[in-house]
């Protein structure tokens, strides 16, 4: 238990020391290891349990297991010491240091810091850009950073020229062209008229052809009937003679 006095690093092993400790507790994010010779426990984060990806620390270690660890970090936060340990840089069978020059540890620490800096900058910039000044009512800065004088002109963030060009292009592309629609309608109407004229001409020609055919048939029938009458008359004359 904490007696109320700030913790000290006097009884802790030196940085990059390798020792064997007992697993005191397993969580979703890592395992806490008892440090020999002191009451403090160190955390082995799941990213430092193995060189392979670890999703469940309980699949790697269990409470009471003895593991080899390397002390890779000590820091004081709110009068409490946080000790970081690593299992993957130590051979779990022999306790041999697999990263004697601490190259792996330094690379991961550098990567972690750059990631934290990037996310912090991104969040800060977005917060500032989306903030509306209470003093002038413009976006992009806080009231404490506002230089506007009472009755003076207001200044706000101006969008980039490229963004304006892209927006204008998209607007032009989306807007219908009034000059194109009438011409298209006229073309369609002309096509419809041509189609109708063709149909009417075809129907007229077919009607005329049918009429001429009927007339030809009628004349041929009349000529045949006249020939038959002539033959009958000739036959009657011969019979009288």
UniProtKB/Swiss-Prot annotation:
UniProt biased composition (Basic and acidic residues): 166-178, 211-225
Domain S1 motif span(s) in chain numbering: 16-88
Listed InterPro entries: NA-bd_OB-fold, S1_domain, ZCCHC17_S1, Znf_CCHC
A biological process term (GO) from this entry: RNA stabilization
Region (Disordered): 161-241
Chief localization: nucleus
Residue spans of biased composition, Basic residues class: 182-198, 226-241
SUPFAM superfamilies: Nucleic acid-binding proteins
Transmembrane segments: none
Pfam families xref list: S1
MF terms in GO: identical protein binding; RNA binding; zinc ion binding
GO cellular component, one term: cytosolic large ribosomal subunit
UniProt modified residues of type N6-acetyllysine: 144
Zn finger region (CCHC-type): 131-148
Intracellular or extracellular location(s): Nucleus, Nucleolus
PROSITE patterns, alphabetized: S1, ZF_CCHC
Classification via SMART domains: S1
Subunit structure: Interacts with PNN. Associates with the 60S ribosomal subunit.
Protein name per UniProt: Zinc finger CCHC domain-containing protein 17
Organism of provenance: Homo sapiens (Human)
Gene: ZCCHC17
């Amino acid at each position: 238990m904490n007696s109320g006095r700030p913790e000290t690093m006097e009884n802790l092993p030196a940085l990059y020391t390798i020792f064997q400790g007992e697993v005191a507790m397993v969580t979703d994010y890592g395992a806490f290891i008892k440090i020999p010779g002191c009451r403090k426990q160190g955390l082995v984060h799941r990213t430092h349990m193995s060189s392979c990806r670890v999703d469940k620390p309980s699949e790697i270690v269990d409470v009471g297991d003895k593991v080899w660890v390397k002390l890779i970090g000590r820091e004081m936060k709110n009068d409490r010491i946080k000790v970081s340990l690593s299992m993957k840089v130590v051979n779990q069978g022999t306790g041999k240091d697999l990263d004697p020059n601490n190259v792996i540890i330094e690379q991961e620490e550098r990567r972690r810091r750059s990631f934290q800096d990037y996310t912090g900058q991104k969040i800060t910039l977005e917060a500032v850009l989306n903030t509306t000044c209470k003093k002038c009512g413009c976006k992009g800065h806080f009231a404490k950073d506002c230089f506007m004088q009472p009755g003076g002109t207001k200044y706000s963030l101006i969008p980039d020229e490229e963004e304006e060009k892209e927006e204008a292009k998209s607007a032009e592309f989306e807007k219908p062209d009034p000059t194109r629609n009438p011409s298209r309608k006229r073309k369609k109407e002309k096509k419809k008229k041509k189609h109708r004229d063709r149909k009417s001409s075809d129907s007229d020609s077919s009607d005329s052809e049918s009429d001429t055919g009927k007339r030809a048939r009628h004349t041929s029938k009349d000529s045949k009937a006249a020939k038959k009458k002539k033959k009958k008359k000739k036959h009657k004359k011969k019979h009288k003679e």
